[in-house]
Amino acid sequence: MKLGVLLRNMGPQSTAATMAACARQAEAAGLDDLWVVDHLAIPPDEAEGSGGRYLDPLGTLAWLAGVTSRIGLGVTVLIAPYRPPLPTAKLVATVQELAAGRLQLGLGVGWMEAEFRALGVPRAKRGALTDELLAFLHNCFANDVVEANGQPFIFAPRPSRPPFLLGGKAEHAFPRILRHGDGWMPMTGDPEALREPVSRLRALFAEAGKPPPQVVPLTQLPLDDPPKARAQLAALEALGVTGIVYAERYADSAGFAPVVERLSALA
């Protein structure tokens, strides 16, 4: 099972100096992946902990590609209906190219009413817009020449397609994952809560003749109790969970260092 950690690309921890130090600490500790999050327009009443400051996730990952050399880079999750398909495909391909194939692309439909209003995007169309983006991304990564709005164009660079890991609740996400995705990013690391949906998703993939899905939950772990944390990871792995994104708040790189040390010790 891959061990990943959430890098705060928001709030006071999102300075270049702090993020670079944290990214290098995670890579040096042997962790598998660094993950960032996506928000574009935080309203004042949702700004606790971030002050409304969020760095763009794809821009951050492109920068992290130059700060690191081995560790995987992912976003959990890119809000698909916020993003126009063609520029997004170009950005995703650029990050994958600069990162030498280390990108993992989590995608979701979004939830925050205020952000949809700020972007002028109808929240009721978020599912259809997500499907549109996913279909376009698949087309771009499969073909040298792609068409948009009736105009053919060369899609280059065209590196290997990153895995598409879709967020959302099982009942809504699973049909979309079967059509467009390589796996699921649930919002819990509770083995009992994941037992039935992971089993169901694996069965759906098998019935469709697809390889087993990647399952990468965003979770916390009892890092102060290593035996208990290892037991939770073992239970998740037995279900078919392929990796985790560990999330914990930290004040600065000095506070991040013990987090990655304790997390990497579980490997």
Language model features with spans:
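N-terminal beta1-alpha1-beta2 module of alpha/beta enzyme domains
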Residues: 1-67, 162, 261-267
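Hydrophobic faces of well-ordered beta-strands that scaffold small-molecule active sites
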Residues: 3-7, 34-36, 72-75, 103-107, ...
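An alpha-helical appendage that flanks or caps ligand/catalytic pockets
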Residues: 27-28, 32, 124-160, 185-267
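Internal, glycine-rich beta/alpha segment that forms the wall or movable "lid"
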Residues: 42-48, 62, 75, 81-180, ...
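Active-site mouth loops of central-metabolism enzymes
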Residues: 5-17, 76-86, 161-169, 216-227
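Glycine-rich, proline-tolerant flexible connector loops at the mouths of alpha/beta enzymes
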Residues: 33-58, 79, 111, 188-193, ...
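Glycine-enriched alpha-helix->loop->beta-strand junction motifs that scaffold or abut catalytic
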Residues: 67-70, 99, 178-185, 239-243
